[in-house]
Amino acid sequence: MVTLRVDEISNIIRERIEQYNREVTIVNTGTVLQVGDGIARIHGLDQVMAGELVEFEEGTVGIALNLESNNVGVVLMGDGLMIQEGSSVKATGRIAQIPVSEAYLGRVINALAKPIDGRGEISASESRLIESPAPGIISRRSVYEPLQTGLIAIDSMIPIGRGQRELIIGDRQTGKTAVATDTILNQKGQNVICLYVAIGQKASSVAQVVTTFQERGAMEYTIVVAETADSPATLQYLAPYTGAALAEYFMYRERHTSIIYDDLSKQAQAYRQMSLLLRRPPGREAYPGDVFYLHSRLLERAAKSSSHLGEGSMTALPIVETQSGDVSAYIPTNVISITDGQIFLSSDLFNAGIRPAINVGISVSRVGSAAQIKAMKQVAGKSKLELAQFAELEAFAQFASDLDKATQNQLARGQRLRELLKQSQSAPLTVEEQILTIYTGANGYLDPLDIGQVKKFLVQLRTHLKTNKPQFQEIISSTKTFTEQAEALLKEAIPEQMELFILQEQT
């Protein structure tokens, strides 16, 4: 018979009593009533806050968006295929935030800041809220530094400044993404961190953009946030805010950032889908009433910080797609009214071979010449007016049979000015090259050439100036002014190259 060792048993009981810790945890829970289409309705969760993250039994996370009297509408940040009716949900007490660090540079991530480029985890010690308040009036200063895009048409006539919000708007297939990606390529060596946010696009298109960046060495200073067309609507809706949070991290560390949202029409559609499924009342074009706030709270985060905050900046270039040039639709008018100007791309110009297909007439920059260096103002100040007059004259000339010599000369000059604004994709020009190009056209040096020869001559002229007159580039980059000395160098170089070019063409 086994003998009971009373002292041993009493010691074990005493130890257990000493180890007993009476802790009570209060968890705010609920039960899934209904799930489907990326939406779940939850009974319970009485203490949940609007925008709070909730966690389902099987691990999916959602955001509580609709707080109704008898249930809570939650949008799922995932497919939610394993969620079952009747399963429990708990409130986390947190709102959506992402890790942020320098290690994100050169990576492709999703809306939850998880890497999707197969290059391992990203280490980050800090985190930022996905939705944080925009800087106030005192925290900002007016825009005064240029953000060079490398595109003559933009930098000379629709200049963009650091901290500005400039909308790129146009029909599909008019080169909106090309303008944005060229701007990123042109930031090489400019100490600007770029973010490219792809919302609801084809995965192949995003891969193409990433490949271009890698080939041109732009990924060193770029972060790509991608939620493709097959992603849940919730993640497409969140992607721009994730990009903005990363850009803000660098902006508040006294750095310059530029962020491209490609495109906000798709984000609005994802938000419309979520809102209709949550049974929120539809408004114009079936969008919910707060779709303006959706974009305004995103774009207001772009700013030029005041000197107290280190003068960092965040420049936003949102893209919006129009249907057959209709700029008066709901989303285009909303975003136009939020931004500091727009670059309008026209399908007619694109099809006529004018690329980038920028309609200079209705494109504006509300920051204006404050975002240009003095040299560019001196050379390109009248370009927009001259082109507008040329377009008017060209329309009139179609009806007139015999034109006087002055009108013919003005038309010829205008055609050459329009020709020099054409540029190949992924071939951005430096400011010095742009100043040289505009000066050559505006002062009639291109008039003796045929229109077909203009591009070839300009390429040769840029090379000639770089090799034989390097002082020109030094003067512009050091003084930021088009001095008499710089003009004298051009007056020498252009006729020299013109003689060589004409001889070359004759042989």
Swiss-Prot record:
The keyword Protein transport does not apply. It catalyses: ATP + H2O + 4 H(+)(in) = ADP + phosphate + 5 H(+)(out). The keyword Kinase does not apply. SUPFAM superfamilies: C-terminal domain of alpha and beta subunits of F1 ATP synthase, N-terminal domain of alpha and beta subunits of F1 ATP synthase, P-loop containing nucleoside triphosphate hydrolases. ATP binds at G170, D171, R172, Q173, T174, G175, K176, T177. It is an enzyme of class 7 (translocase). It comes from the Eukaryota. InterPro entries: ATP_synth_asu-like_sf, ATP_synth_asu_C, ATP_synth_asu_C_sf, ATP_synth_F1_a_nt-bd_dom, ATP_synth_F1_asu, ATPase_a/bsu_AS, ATPase_F1/V1/A1_a/bsu_N, ATPase_F1/V1/A1_a/bsu_N_sf. CDD domains: ATP-synt_F1_alpha_C, ATP-synt_F1_alpha_N, F1-ATPase_alpha_CD. PROSITE patterns: ATPASE_ALPHA_BETA. Keywords: ATP synthesis, ATP-binding, CF(1), Chloroplast, Hydrogen ion transport, Ion transport, Membrane, Nucleotide-binding, Plastid, Thylakoid, Translocase, Transport. It is a peripheral membrane protein. One of its GO terms (cellular component) is chloroplast thylakoid membrane. The record marks S363 as: Required for activity. GO terms for molecular function: ADP binding; ATP binding; proton-transporting ATP synthase activity, rotational mechanism. It is found in: Plastid, Chloroplast thylakoid membrane. Its EC number is 7.1.2.2. F-type ATPases have 2 components, CF(1) - the catalytic core - and CF(0) - the membrane proton channel. CF(1) has five subunits: alpha(3), beta(3), gamma(1), delta(1), epsilon(1). CF(0) has four main subunits: a, b, b' and c. Belongs to the ATPase alpha/beta chains family. PANTHER family: ATP SYNTHASE SUBUNIT ALPHA, MITOCHONDRIAL. Produces ATP from ADP in the presence of a proton gradient across the membrane. The alpha chain is a regulatory subunit. This is ATP synthase subunit alpha, chloroplastic. The gene is atpA.
